[in-house]
Amino acid sequence: MITLGNRQFSGPFISPLWSPPRAPGLYAVMVPGWRLLMFHAVHFGHAADLSVPELIRGNPKYGYWLTLAGTEWNLYVATCEMYQSTVGEREAAYRELLVLPTTTTRGQAHAQL
């Protein structure tokens, strides 16, 4: 578990080994920080089904994330499942994540396990 904003996320999981849940919710794409077990979120998103095959690799920013991570094995995904949520509820939660303080290194938020 990892906390981003005021929400608990499962993970982070190494992207190539990640088994996405069949659930609506939020997700964060993350890269490792400079300290052990420190991660920086480089992207937040929401989806009606987190198990959509191209959720991560199909994103137009995927190449940029790989540039930051160096390899897909340094790209991590964390999810916050929101069962029985509406699109509006997921969008509101997503907007809450976007206002997190930015870090000086790579992304919008950082978290430590």
Predicted regions and their residues:
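GIY-YIG nuclease catalytic motif and its immediate N-terminal context
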Residues: 1-56, 84-99, 111-113
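Acidic, metal/cofactor-coordinating or nucleic-acid-engaging core segments within structured domains
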Residues: 67-80, 85-104
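Generic hydrophobic, helix-prone segments enriched in Leu/Val/Ile
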Residues: 9, 42, 62-69, 104
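A broadly used, surface-exposed interaction patch
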Residues: 52-72
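Coupling/hinge elements of helicase-like and P-loop NTPase modules
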Residues: 103-111
